């Protein structure tokens, strides 16, 4: 069973006694920086010259400096820029500013797990990753609650890495809800697998295949959209609240029977075998290297896939249908 840690297990004074740099000010960056600041921590935000986020961070009362200045000032450096550019930011702005006893923090383990960033031996390498988007992390903190976090230590140069990670997690409200101890390897591999096989890749492919099956059989795209995409939220919300049990308790017996007898025909042993191949490609670094090559090679295939799906009948149908739904915010669609 997982080890869980709460407020009583974490000493906030540890992180309060350090100087923290949050590199990046996106979804997670703003939540970490503001919540740490409100927890009495000395925080600065590191942003590159010309960053659009600088004005927002300063308006919210944070001091903004360049990433290299932030790294030079701080002894705890949390890297929260996108995965593909973390290694570049590290090499250009952080590496030469690290001192023995410093701590390098991450919100996701990809660059450490696959060796794109190789910290020196004298620094702690830690992870604190809230299991929720930044806006939720910040809102829960302000309301006196928290979002569960996972925490890990890859390199414990000082012998105090996990205590520091717990203290950091407490500073953003994580220990109010609970912190699960993990490893960089476990977090990275399971996170990538979940995204690819279930949450994003698996779900998107399932929705598209179902929609195409109905429309190719002559059913109206609008009806197919409702049945294969729109109503997915209703089911996922029930699963989110109470697992498969609550979902099955809430649906009709007809739907539940269809779940039992048809689900295994869609997700077959062959599907699971392919999932195992996907996991193996994550574990051996094939996916990570391919993604880095794609990103730094100009994102040609990425943009082709993106454009192809943007023009899919599912998407064009959905954009029109969502105009009928006053409760749906489709401003960014």
From Swiss-Prot:
Residue positions binding Mg(2+) 2: 191, 227, 231
The protein's annotated pathway: Amino-acid biosynthesis; L-isoleucine biosynthesis; L-isoleucine from 2-oxobutanoate: step 2/4; Amino-acid biosynthesis; L-valine biosynthesis; L-valine from pyruvate: step 2/4
Annotated positions binding substrate: 252
Statement: the UniProt record of this protein carries the keyword Mitochondrion: no
CC cofactor: Mg(2+)
Record-listed E.C. numbers: 1.1.1.86
Comment on bound cofactor: Binds 2 magnesium ions per subunit.
Role of this protein: Involved in the biosynthesis of branched-chain amino acids (BCAA). Catalyzes an alkyl-migration followed by a ketol-acid reduction of (S)-2-acetolactate (S2AL) to yield (R)-2,3-dihydroxy-isovalerate. In the isomerase reaction, S2AL is rearranged via a Mg-dependent methyl migration to produce 3-hydroxy-3-methyl-2-ketobutyrate (HMKB). In the reductase reaction, this 2-ketoacid undergoes a metal-dependent reduction by NADPH to yield (R)-2,3-dihydroxy-isovalerate.
Keyword Amino-acid biosynthesis tagged: yes
Record domain KARI N-terminal Rossmann: where: 2-182
Broad EC category: oxidoreductase
Protein family according to the UniProt entry: Belongs to the ketol-acid reductoisomerase family.
Keywords tagged on the record: Amino-acid biosynthesis, Branched-chain amino acid biosynthesis, Magnesium, Metal-binding, NADP, Oxidoreductase
Binding site residues for Mg(2+) 1: 191, 195
Active site: 108
Catalysed conversion reaction: (2R)-2,3-dihydroxy-3-methylbutanoate + NADP(+) = (2S)-2-acetolactate + NADPH + H(+); (2R,3R)-2,3-dihydroxy-3-methylpentanoate + NADP(+) = (S)-2-ethyl-2-hydroxy-3-oxobutanoate + NADPH + H(+)
Pfam family, one: KARI_C
Residues where NADP(+) binds: 25-28, 51, 53, 83-86, 134
GO molecular function, one term: magnesium ion binding
Name of the protein: Ketol-acid reductoisomerase (NADP(+))
InterPro entries, per the entry: 6-PGluconate_DH-like_C_sf, KARI, KARI_C, KARI_N, KARI_prok, NAD(P)-bd_dom_sf
UniProt-listed GO biological process terms: isoleucine biosynthetic process; L-valine biosynthetic process
Positions of the KARI C-terminal knotted domain: 183-328
NCBIfam families assigned: ilvC, PRK05479.1, PRK13403.1
Native source organism of the sequence: Streptomyces avermitilis (strain ATCC 31267 / DSM 46492 / JCM 5070 / NBRC 14893 / NCIMB 12804 / NRRL 8165 / MA-4680)
Entry GO terms, CC: cytosol
